[in-house]
Each structure stands twice: as structure tokens, then as C-alpha cells.
């Protein structure tokens, strides 16, 4: 048995050794250095470009998907690479990819001040060209009719030109002469808005 004095001495010794909860500071958990994160991202970018050069699109797609998961990667700078990969790996997903980009980076300066050169006004013409390449003329025409009513799209000459070309293409598919004439008149109107004179 310990004597009372010995127990008191041991308690006082433990108190002197134990950290004071009021003065103790919990050390921060060490996180990976930003330097290492940057290296990993650079390595993934290099791998993705190498796979694209070798036309290894499935592996390039995996590298791109890993880059998308990183918070420090700005997708608006890599959107065209992502579109190229999707067109090779999963063409059906390309339209959804472009629609999400347009929704994520709206062409409204009050909302999207950080991306003046990478917003929906920049992505939308590429989306229309994608639909034209796939011969989805009706869908492209419907989108243009909707967006050309809104600024800043109605001030984009390229979109008016695309609309004019689509009107000519849709006029070819019309059996009715009156409907064909309507499409041709609409094409002339859009070309004039694009600053192009068309003689028919």
C-alpha cells in the first residue's frame, strides 16, 4: 500500500507532466503541399496530351475525368479537349457536355465576371456546329431561334450566319413551295443580320 504522502506526490507529479488543456494547442493535420498537387495535375495533363497524340482516347478520357475532379482545374480552359475526347469515346454524351458548360458559365456579366472570354457566348457557337456536323438541323434551328432573341447572342454575326445556313438546308427538305419560300426568306434575313449579301 502507498502511504498518503506518496499518493499525493505522485498526483502532483502527474499534474506537472500532463498538458494544460487551456494552454495546449492541437497541432494541425499535415496536408499535402500545393506543390505536390500541382505536380500531379501537370503529370495528368501531360499524360492526357500524350494519349491524344497516340490516339489512345479511352486512356485520355480517364486522365481528363481525373482532372475534372480536381478543384484547382478550370474546366473552361479545357472544354475543347474534353469535347474532342467525348466525340471519340462517347459521342452521345457530347451534347450533354456542351449543355452543362453553357449552364455552368452563363453569358451574363453580372454573374460571370471571372470568365469574360470563356462563357456560354463562347461555347454556344461550338455547340451549334456540333449539332450541324451531326445533321441535327431541327434541334440546332430551334436553339438558334430561342437564343437569337437574347443579348448578347443576337449581336453575334456567326450565329446569324449559322441560322441562315440551316434555313437553306431545311428549305431543301420541304416539299411545299410556300414553306420552302418561308425558309429562304428567313435565311436572307439572318444573312443580312450577319452582314452577308445573298443573291438568289
Swiss-Prot record:
Q: Name one Pfam family in it.
A: Rrn11
SUPFAM superfamilies (UniProt xref): TPR-like
Name the cystine pairs: none
Q: What's a BP term from Gene Ontology annotated to this protein?
A: transcription initiation at RNA polymerase I promoter
One GO MF term on file is:
RNA polymerase I core promoter sequence-specific DNA binding
InterPro entries assigned to the protein according to its UniProt record, in alphabetical order: RNA_pol_I-specific_init_factor, TIF_Rrn11, TPR-like_helical_dom_sf
The coiled-coil regions, if any, are none
UniProt keywords, alphabetically: Nucleus, Transcription, Transcription regulation
Transcription as a keyword of this entry, yes or no, is yes
Spell out the protein name for this chain: RNA polymerase I-specific transcription initiation factor rrn11
User: An example Gene Ontology cellular component term from the record?
Assistant: cytosol
Q: What is its main location?
A: nucleus
The encoding gene is: rrn11
The task this protein performs is described as: Subunit of a multiprotein complex essential for the initiation of rDNA transcription by RNA polymerase I. Binding to the DNA template is dependent on the initial binding of other factors.
Where does it live in the cell? Answer: Nucleus
**Looking at the keywords, is Transcription present?**
yes
Amino acid at each position: 500500500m502507498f502511504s498518503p504522502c506518496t499518493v499525493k506526490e505522485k498526483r502532483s507529479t502527474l499534474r506537472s507532466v500532463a498538458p494544460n488543456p487551456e494552454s495546449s494547442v492541437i497541432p494541425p493535420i499535415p496536408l499535402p503541399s500545393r506543390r505536390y498537387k500541382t505536380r500531379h495535375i501537370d503529370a495528368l495533363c501531360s499524360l492526357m496530351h500524350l494519349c491524344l497524340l497516340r490516339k489512345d482516347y479511352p486512356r485520355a478520357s480517364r486522365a481528363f475525368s481525373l482532372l475534372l475532379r480536381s478543384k484547382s482545374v478550370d474546366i473552361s480552359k479545357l472544354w475543347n479537349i474534353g469535347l474532342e475526347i467525348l466525340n471519340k469515346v462517347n459521342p452521345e454524351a457530347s451534347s450533354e457536355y456542351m449543355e452543362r458548360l453553357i449552364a455552368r458559365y452563363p453569358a451574363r456579366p453580372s454573374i460571370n465576371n471571372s470568365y469574360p472570354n470563356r462563357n456560354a457566348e463562347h461555347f454556344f457557337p461550338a455547340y451549334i456546329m456540333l449539332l450541324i456536323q451531326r445533321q441535327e438541323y431541327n434541334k440546332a434551328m430551334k436553339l438558334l431561334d430561342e437564343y437569337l432573341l437574347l443579348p448578347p447572342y443576337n449581336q453575334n454575326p456567326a450565329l446569324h450566319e449559322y441560322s441562315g445556313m440551316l434555313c437553306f438546308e431545311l428549305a431543301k427538305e420541304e416539299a411545299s413551295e410556300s414553306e420552302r419560300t418561308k425558309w429562304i426568306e428567313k435565311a436572307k434575313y439572318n444573312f443580312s443580320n450577319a452582314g452577308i449579301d445573298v443573291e438568289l
